[in-house]
Swiss-Prot record:
GO terms for cellular component: cytoplasm. The lineage of its organism: Bacteria, Bacillati, Actinomycetota, Actinomycetes, Bifidobacteriales. This is Acetylglutamate kinase. Belongs to the acetylglutamate kinase family. ArgB subfamily. The record marks 41, 260 as: Transition state stabilizer. The keyword Amino-acid biosynthesis applies. It is an enzyme of class 2 (transferase). It comes from Bifidobacterium longum (strain DJO10A). Substrate binds at residues 76-77, 98, 199. Keywords: Amino-acid biosynthesis, Arginine biosynthesis, ATP-binding, Cytoplasm, Kinase, Nucleotide-binding, Transferase.
Amino acid sequence: MKGPGFHFDVHTDLRADQKAEVLIEALPWLEEFAGQRIVVKYGGNAMVDDHLKQCFAEDMVFLRQVGLHPIVVHGGGPQISHMLKALGIKSEFKGGLRVTTPEAMDVVRMVLTGKVSRELVGLINAHGPLAVGLSGEDGGLFSAMQRRPIINGKPTDIGLVGDVVSVDASAVEDLVAAGRIPVVSSVAPNEEDATEVLNVNADSAAAALAAAVGAHKLVILTDVDGLYADWPDKNSLIGRIGVETLRDMLPDLESGMRPKMEACVRAIDGGVPQAHIIDGRKPHSILNEIFTSAGIGTMVMPDEGLEMRSSYGY
């Protein structure tokens, strides 16, 4: 597809009438979400596979061009691990969490703000001057508190790792007002010592930012189809779930999924109407979630009578 300032390579076997049906299906969602803010947590395989990176950038450009305001928050676990290994710095994990020493924090900061952010900004800006990179340090965007998780029943020191405790979204608001796509790296100053920077969980940071900017949706990309009621039974994929039901499930979730679902709960508690977990391994999965009637993945909503339903049982 060609247009002023951008070029997407789209290959499809759909007939012309089928293509028209796809566009018509998107119409009510284009109307509903016009002018709305969508916070997207960029992660998983979508940020390491070159084709998926390109698809993600195209999705962000598409959202902006049709009148939505995407805001991207990213981590960079695989890239951080690769750089630490290349520099001969040991990576240690406790309870599934990376122990971040001052030496490792320098690498985290460098990789997130100087590599992952710059690459994504470049991919988006290949379609026009839309994206602007910033970190949680910029303009006091995030403030974090050092984290001491309970591991094996004891508070455990995992170094310069924190949780976002406050958000000043002024810098992001200014970029959105200017028609830009903010791309936010998940590092933040320590609220007890602003000269110290903490590595913060990108899922939680995205949820906090979504609440602060009044986003209509939080969308978290991951490497599974969504939340399963009875993993590994693939037929137990949950299409929609109320936040209170999800809150009760949190203690029993496996370690990889729990922080993502905790982020969904945090977003809903903060007033975001919808939070989604979708499979970022599938090209253009964000567009499928937002602009199709069935949607994909798992959607979390305020309860208000909403019962848990199996996938696609809308």
